A protein has these predicted regions:
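Active-site-proximal loop/turn and secondary-structure-junction residues that shape catalytic pockets
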Residues: 48-50, 76-78, 104-106, 146-148, ...
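Catalytic-core regions built around general acid/base machinery
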Residues: 86-94, 170-175, 232, 262-266
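Active-site acidic/histidine proton-transfer and metal-coordination neighborhood
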Residues: 12-22, 34, 116-214, 299-303, ...
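Structural motif corresponding to the early beta-alpha repeats
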Residues: 70, 74-169, 273, 277-287, ...
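Conserved dinucleotide-binding and phosphotransfer motif residues
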Residues: 67, 94, 178, 270
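Histidine-acidic metal/acid-base catalytic patches
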Residues: 2-43, 50, 55-65, 138, ...
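Acidic-residue sensor for enzyme active/binding pockets
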Residues: 73, 185, 191, 226, ...
């Protein structure tokens, strides 16, 4: 049974105050000298702390900047416009860029049979584009091709791909006006059914056929759904617009069993020059953690940020990315 908007999406986007504030800088950060990859910017997804865009994230953003990140990624929640404007200004004042992540629920499902619900999905995506524009963000990523954790008990149908493409094509037109790129995410079979693999995702992006609608690659989901990392990156590379660096357990990148050398070598072979953004999860925001079934701490939060950045930089150097 599909979760209601109140019980799922509101959990994603209506979590409370931060439960873990920023401690003093570690010796890692004091000694860290930023090694810039040749072409790629490195970001960190703030869902590790909160699903809410608010001023409470400012100290965290400041510390991420001191560690050496190029940008931060925030969730698109239902807060007022001014919260996004303040957040964007604070990030840009620190010299950081912003990217965004969006999910939609069953009441805003782009593949629903109801035209009214599909219109609500388009309105929701347009709202997110407006908020991205408020923050001067250029990328919105996420699995908003269909509703998160909403299932019919059947495989995806041709009609559902057609409906999704129609909504996303209109969203792409709107995004172009704001100079925003929508990067769609294939996620695992336990969280959606429309796009689990790069093959399905590329097929959808090609149906949309709009320059402001591209694909993203998430290593966590690829580790579950793809036969080979190299083959899946080869498949998505012509339409690839964003990458999430995420370990198999959602902990510190490099500490698990994702095939990182194969991943970075394949990205380098295709001269990928977009964002490499760490997406790692914690229980710092209990409502969000419960909504995505995170029941334990995979790694200390700041260890994920510190060691994750160092890991990506070293992999970029190793594979000349």
């Amino acid at each position: 049974m599909a979760p209601s908007r109140r019980t799922f999406i509101h959990q994603l986007t209506s979590a409370g105050t931060l439960s873990v504030m920023t401690p003093v800088l570690s010796q890692f950060e004091i000694k860290q000298t930023k090694i810039k990859p040749m072409n790629n910017k490195i970001g960190f997804n703030l869902l590790a702390w909160s699903a809410i865009v608010s001023d409470e994230l400012f100290p965290i953003v400041e510390r991420l900047q001191k560690i050496g990140y190029d940008g931060v990624e925030c969730a698109m929640d239902a807060r007022e416009k001014s919260a996004y404007q303040r957040f964007g200004k604070h990030a840009h004042d620190l010299g950081l860029e912003v990217t965004c992540v969006l999910a939609v629920g069953p009441e805003e499902n782009p593949i629903d049979g109801s035209l009214n619900i599909r219109q609500k999905s388009l309105d929701r995506i347009k709202w997110a584009i407006d908020r991205a524009h408020d923050m001067e963000a250029k990328v919105i990523c996420g699995p908003f091709h269909s509703a998160f954790a909403t299932f019919t008990g059947q495989p995806p149908t041709e009609k559902e791909y057609v409906r999704s493409a129609e909504v996303l094509r209109q969203a792409g037109e709107y995004a172009a006006q704001a100079e925003v790129t929508l990067t769609l995410e294939a996620i695992n079979r336990f969280e959606c059914y429309l796009c689990n693999t790069m093959g399905q995702l590329v097929g959808l992006v090609e149906r949309v056929s709009h320059p402001n609608v591209k694909a993203m690659y998430d290593t966590h989901h690829a580790n579950m759904e793809e036969k080979k990392f190299k083959m899946s990156i080869n498949k998505v590379s012509p339409v690839l617009g964003h990458v999430h660096i995420s370990e198999n357990d959602r902990g510190t990148p490099g500490d698990g069993h994702v095939l990182w050398d194969e991943t970075f070598a394949s990205l380098a072979a295709h001269q990928y020059n977009g964002w490499l953004t760490i997406e790692a999860f914690t229980r710092n925001d209990p409502k969000f953690a419960n909504a995505i079934n995170v029941w334990r701490e995979f790694s200390p939060t700041w260890e994920m940020a510190e060691n994750g950045l160092n890991f990506i930089q070293n992999m970029c150097i190793k594979h000349k990315l």
